[in-house]
Amino acid sequence: MHNKIDILIFGGQSNMQGETECLPAPNDPVENALEYRYLSNSFVPLVHPVGEDIEDGLLWGADKGFGSLLPDFCRAYVANTGKTVVAIHAARGATMVSEWLKGTPRYDCALKKVQGGIEAAKQLGEIDKIYYIWLQGESDAIFRTTCADYKKMLTAYKNDLKVDMGIHKFGIIEVGYFCGTVRWLQDRTKEEGRMDDEIIMTAQEQIVEEDNDFVMLTQICKELSLNAEYINPDADGHYNNKAMARIGQEAGTALAKL
């Protein structure tokens, strides 16, 4: 293994948690990458499924033990950097940005996991970069968080992660369409739903222009979320394994180029 280790922390809601249609195959371990597991304070090969259920639902592993974007993201990152990666999955579906802020139980839970992973990784080699990767916003679109409020909360969250986790950059995988596509959301038209989605998209696009701590890794979710070929047929608004592979590869390659 390379003696320089990068820590990649993955946060957000269900599409970061992973809510795909099945366990991907093939499912080979990612070379030069490990996943940190908090409950056992150990490293495991980075394969599907990722994550773990912690503290009565504050964090969840990949839904039903199926797929996520993490392995493809890390495989692309390793291929483009030649470095060793420790992946830390700290996501939970159906969460607004306000539920991740410092002072909430979820923040404390995620922080314990990340700090545990960083300390354990020091036994493997020298830690170089610590990056946070975020895929979230569908719930804020549902509840119509304003652009200004979303930016204010995400900036506060990032600032606290810089202090408490030592992150070097906050990478954003821009959220896709959700309110404008799901069948079960009956309190607005599809056009209104897309407008709600675009408020969060705009917030994420603006924040990377206004604050250099943020970096846009990919906007591909806007395209994939409107194409049934990339949607889990069993879960409206959630990406299938084919989509996760594309999102992970594109975002991981982008982060490697920083």
Predicted regions and their residues:
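Cell-envelope and extracellular/periplasmic
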Residues: 1-258
